Amino acid sequence: MPLEYMGGRLATLDDVDVRGKKVIVRFDLNSPVGNGGEILDDSRIAEAAGTLRELCDRGAAVVALSHQGRPLESDFVSLERHASLLSRYSGVEVRFVMDVIGPEALRTVASLRPGEAVLLDNTRIISEDFIEAEGTVHARGIMVTRLSKLANMYVNEAFSASHRSQASIVGFPYVLPSAGGRVLEKEIRSLNRAVSSGERPKVVVLGGAKLKDAVRIVDYLSSSGVADEVLTTGLVGLLFLYARGYRLPRDVTKLLEKKGGEEAIAKARRIVEEGRRVRTPIDFVVEVGDKIYIKPADELTEGVPKDIGPSTVEYFRAKMRGARVIVMRGPAGVIEDPRFRRGTVELVKAALSSGAYTVFGGGHFRAILRDLPEHLSSKVGHLSTGGGALLYYLSGRPLPGVKALVDSARIFNLV
């Protein structure tokens, strides 16, 4: 059935007939890579395998695309190992071509038969796929022009890259009938429920260290009325305490200035001055030298706050009680260190015990949820792998990749 997005509708795999068609599928197989080129976390590849298998089972010939890393960085590698893993997880033999739009790639795509699949190499080998431009502009580019001539349909299965306006994300929907893949569909449906449904109250818990994005999200959620409560943790909580005039150790204020800049600090101050409903931690777990203390928020004169304290956990737990929807994005502390993991774990437990529909955003939650007892972990509504796309969604900004699918549904009369 069609999927609602920002007042429009896009097609899903349930709305299109793929039998006998050559389908370009843009996955996001981008994964952490070790020094030897080995893939350290293949969860995105495993997730993509289901969609690839479905399309092949339904009689499509699948041309898979993805990026990996950024040019000149250590994780900018070929997708050959990705193809091997995609084959293993999907049960489909996925051929690999060390080419994207050259003669070998085009010959392979042209000869592909129903039920077969090929993964072309890293799309960012092509400079067009590292340029931000409108979809109608990218539709005239070399990558989209060459590949679309050999295909009948396009599927976006890269929700986590859909905040980018790059050729392989936004160009194809303007020249080929296009639909959202299963992972993208699940992300949008879950986030629509979390943000756009009439279920109230909605509580959003924001932590982590991405201050510019977090302040933009707080600004949108608190001004639009989307969230009934915004609870801040991590560096985000410290930023809003700083905006309220709390004295913080110099090392902390320098970090806030470095991570957020004057713009984020000024915006946080404006939000505070307008009296919006943004809650901040009331105590912290603080590391001072080789010792650890619990300190109230108004006594942070030395050391480095590494986690929220027990009083904050109880304060925020009370705010979650009775919520119908809870969204958590970013950790409450430095969870890589077991000593500073408790705040995040306890908030996750509180959310799952509340009876609310819960959405967790960020890869760090995967490990935490895996360690919880089954009676709690089974209550997870949705674990988003959206990354930057999730931040865009929560801040009310349109996702170019999804908007292009809405446009395609209209252009090709798909829904």
Swiss-Prot record:
Superkingdom field: Archaea
EC category: transferase
GO MF, one example: ATP binding
Main location: cytoplasm
UniProt record, GO biological process: gluconeogenesis; glycolytic process
UniProt GO cellular component terms: cytosol
Coiled-coil regions, chain positions: none
Binding site for substrate: 28-30, 44, 67-70, 124, 164
Record keywords: ATP-binding, Cytoplasm, Glycolysis, Kinase, Nucleotide-binding, Transferase
UniProt pathway: Carbohydrate degradation; glycolysis; pyruvate from D-glyceraldehyde 3-phosphate: step 2/5
Record: residues binding ATP: 336, 362-365
Catalytic reactions on record: (2R)-3-phosphoglycerate + ATP = (2R)-3-phospho-glyceroyl phosphate + ADP
Cellular compartments annotated: Cytoplasm
EC number(s) stated in the UniProt entry for this protein: 2.7.2.3
Pfam families the UniProt entry points to: PGK (PF00162)
Family: Belongs to the phosphoglycerate kinase family.
Name listed for the protein in its UniProt record: Phosphoglycerate kinase
The species this protein was found in: Aeropyrum pernix (strain ATCC 700893 / DSM 11879 / JCM 9820 / NBRC 100138 / K1)
Gene that encodes it: pgk
